[in-house]
Amino acid sequence: VLSGANLGTTPTHILRAVAEAGALRFAAIGNLLLQLAPNAQIVFSGGVLENVPAWQPIVCDALGAPLVGSREHEASARGAALLAWEKLGVALPEDFERGETLEPNAENHAIYERALERQNALYERLK
């Protein structure tokens, strides 16, 4: 659903809206994961976040938390295992090859928090 579009909406606006909507879903998931592991780092590897660097600050700002690049292969499987180990109280290795760390912009994050509230409200209305 594209909410708020009008006759002045350009293809560039739509592309940005799609990027931000995806980032907000990542933020919703990230918020849930950070409740389980408050000190966890949000790490990404591969896929669109690695291949579309312009999307990285959008996701980082939506999350409101640092976003750490990983150069590890199979990083998603590794991350799931680390989360499980942490919940079991097992000491976690910190030896993965890190890429760049992005820091969120607080002003942008506040805007994205309000946008996530609107997105969640829209999802509830559409159920």
Question: What label would you give each PLM region?
Answer:
Residues 1-127:
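Glycine/Thr-rich phosphate-binding loops that ligate phosphate moieties of nucleotide
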